[in-house]
Amino acid sequence: MLEKISDTLTFECETGNYHTFCPISCVAWLYQKIEDSFFLVVGTKTCGYFLQNALGVMIFAEPRYAMAELEEGDISAQLNDYEELKRLCIQIKKDRNPSVIVWIGTCTTEIIKMDLEGMAPKLEAEIGIPIVVARANGLDYAFTQGEDTVLAAIVHRCPDYKLQNKTDLTDNDIQEDATRFSFLKLRKNNIRSISATNSHPPLVLFGSLPTTVSSQLNLELKRNQIEVSGWLPTQRYTDLPSLGEGVYVCGVNPFLSRTATTLMRRKKCKLISAPFPIGPDGTRAWIEKICNVFNIQPTGLEERENKIWDGLEDYLDLVRGKSVFFMGDNLLEISLARFLIRCGMIVYEIGIPYMDKRYQAAELMLLQKTCEMMNVPLPRIVEKPDNYNQIQRIRELKPDLAITGMAHANPLEARGISTKWSVEFTFAQIHGFTNARDILELVTRPLRRNQSLHELGWNNLVKVNSQ
């Protein structure tokens, strides 16, 4: 199946299986980002094994997430789901006293039709802690969409935006805003609506990034006279940004299309469709688009980008002319491919589990522009790739590097194809100007390893038995 969206950009759609992590893995980074939260995954033993093995947290670390394990009595409706969840949440409140409890639904809760959304409001009122329900189950296309589901659920809990020209609030304003957080002890400055004192409308960025990276992006925008009003998610649940008509929002990750839709439809926010700030070229385009929307002239971005490229020259010498093949895993493929093409690499194919063409429209345009600038043909973009067909194409093309999910890495290595786990790009700091070096460090590691082995005369990693 082919779908042509422009004169030169063509998508292919196959019917392959999704060999990817489960979306409940979003707990791994979200519980660290939202510091006053507690994540309760409602699922089976399989979910528990996955969390324990994938996250690898020591038992003494006492992480702020737990597993509510479904047993036969739950599935056969012999036990009262509400009473069981109430018992667990009371225990969580006693031990941790979080500002919010996030229930993560799984495949099993979908199959047995467990009414988590119906139970949450009643239990929330009973125990006095907000409960957010997110169905981050394995029915999604990619594991990164678990974060998308959680953020979309949190959007509904954000206070409504009120345009005010003065910072003082009346008692009525405070009382109205406090109803949304009636279970929390909020200070007056926590529930203050965004004040219209800036030269531009309020801007809220959405996407979970490490605090250092989000601070860097805030600083880059501040250099261009743009103040960020808030982030989603915030480090503390009690500091959620105000959202509503007149608030502009912009995403930092390509897998947050559900959150973007919720912000536009439910909160009436205005979405800034921009390329994602991955790589110096993407970060510059991201800032320029935001400045353009606010009618602000950006300053010094070209010099800033050129300086970063100059600092990457030692890595660029290693990747220039090398070929790469994306098998598709985490929805970061388009942004990473665009950056690597700009670095001088040849991208044979971009496999991607799912493509929201509206949300990624600006990124696709930048990909096309980058290919024209580097004078290279546009790569194949294959949605829902069939892994068997991909293996045949990899055999024919013989790329220098395949960026793939963990399931295919070892089999490809055994066939002489160098690989890099795509999940590493999910957990690495890849956003902003200064983190472009980290992307190239990941990409060049297998290439440098091969070069070192070749110098030692070790041309094969797989031992071949002599006849």
Curated annotation (Swiss-Prot):
How is the co-factor bound, per the entry?
Answer: Binds 1 [4Fe-4S] cluster per heterodimer. The cluster is bound at the heterodimer interface by residues from both subunits.
Q: What class of enzyme is it?
A: oxidoreductase
The beginning of the lineage is: Eukaryota, Viridiplantae, Streptophyta, Charophyceae, Charales
Provide the assembly information.
Protochlorophyllide reductase is composed of three subunits; ChlL, ChlN and ChlB. Forms a heterotetramer of two ChlB and two ChlN subunits.
UniProt: [4Fe-4S] cluster binding residues: C22, C47, C107
Query: Which cofactor does the UniProt annotation name?
Result: [4Fe-4S] cluster
Major subcellular site: plastid
The name on file for this protein is Light-independent protochlorophyllide reductase subunit N
Single biological process term from Gene Ontology: light-independent chlorophyll biosynthetic process
Any single Pfam family the record assigns to this protein: Oxidored_nitro
Q: What does this protein do?
A: Component of the dark-operative protochlorophyllide reductase (DPOR) that uses Mg-ATP and reduced ferredoxin to reduce ring D of protochlorophyllide (Pchlide) to form chlorophyllide a (Chlide). This reaction is light-independent. The NB-protein (ChlN-ChlB) is the catalytic component of the complex.
Give the record's GO CC terms: chloroplast
Q: Which family does it belong to?
A: Belongs to the BchN/ChlN family.
Q: Describe the reaction catalysed, as an equation.
A: chlorophyllide a + oxidized 2[4Fe-4S]-[ferredoxin] + 2 ADP + 2 phosphate = protochlorophyllide a + reduced 2[4Fe-4S]-[ferredoxin] + 2 ATP + 2 H2O
Which controlled-vocabulary keywords does the entry list? 4Fe-4S, ATP-binding, Chlorophyll biosynthesis, Chloroplast, Iron, Iron-sulfur, Metal-binding, Nucleotide-binding, Oxidoreductase, Photosynthesis, Plastid
Metabolic or biological pathway, per its Swiss-Prot or TrEMBL entry: Porphyrin-containing compound metabolism; chlorophyll biosynthesis (light-independent)
Q: Which GO terms describe its molecular function?
A: 4 iron, 4 sulfur cluster binding; ATP binding; metal ion binding; oxidoreductase activity, acting on iron-sulfur proteins as donors; oxidoreductase activity, acting on the CH-CH group of donors, iron-sulfur protein as acceptor
**Localization of this protein:** Plastid, Chloroplast
Q: What is its EC number?
A: 1.3.7.7
